[in-house]
């Protein structure tokens, strides 16, 4: 156990990751009010996780052209406000929300369902790098944690818990987006 802890500390230090503990000033305060908030988060980036307004934008991975246009317009409309956009760095709505935030200069944070060593899906690796310039990446998963199915509902509770509002751009009748909105 001690060896694993030493490896984790080394990984954090080598990759510029900040551990945020539940009572730290930089820990997302909205999330700290949730009964199931994580004791610790791993954060890499420069966005204020306690911005005046935090808006989660979520939705289907299979976004339509109509959904893309609506998502981009929503983000553009938020660009005049002091807002942080949060999403899950997945395909579809999440990626459009993050890309649009980068485009309009809005801080955006991707909450991941795996450790910081992996960007999932890997197609979003370049997007994740861009987000580090004005935003960041956040996870409760230790290094080495893979993007396993059970991690995504836990990720979704962080997205909802740290946000003032959850906007579902486009979704199937059943799925993670509507579950996130209900949280």
Where are these regions (language model features)?
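Long amphipathic alpha-helical segments
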Residues: 1-12
């Amino acid at each position: 156990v001690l060896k694993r802890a030493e490896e984790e500390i080394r990984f954090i230090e080598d990759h510029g990751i900040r551990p945020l503990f539940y009572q730290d000033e930089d820990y997302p305060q909205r999330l700290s009010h949730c009964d199931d908030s994580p004791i610790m988060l791993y954060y890499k980036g420069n966005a204020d996780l306690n911005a005046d307004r935090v808006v989660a934008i979520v939705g289907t991975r299979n976004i339509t052209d109509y959904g893309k246009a609506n998502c981009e317009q929503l983000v553009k409309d938020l660009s005049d406000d002091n807002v942080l956009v949060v999403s899950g760095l997945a395909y579809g709505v999440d990626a459009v929300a993050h890309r649009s935030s980068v485009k309009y200069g809005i801080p955006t944070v991707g909450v991941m369902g795996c450790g910081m060593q992996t960007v999932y899906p890997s197609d979003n690796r370049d997007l994740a790098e861009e987000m580090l310039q004005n935003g960041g990446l956040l996870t409760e998963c230790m290094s080495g944690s893979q993007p396993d199915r059970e991690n995504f509902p836990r990720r979704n509770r962080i997205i909802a818990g740290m946000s003032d509002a959850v906007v579902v751009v486009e979704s199937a009748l059943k799925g993670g987006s509507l579950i996130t909105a209900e949280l």
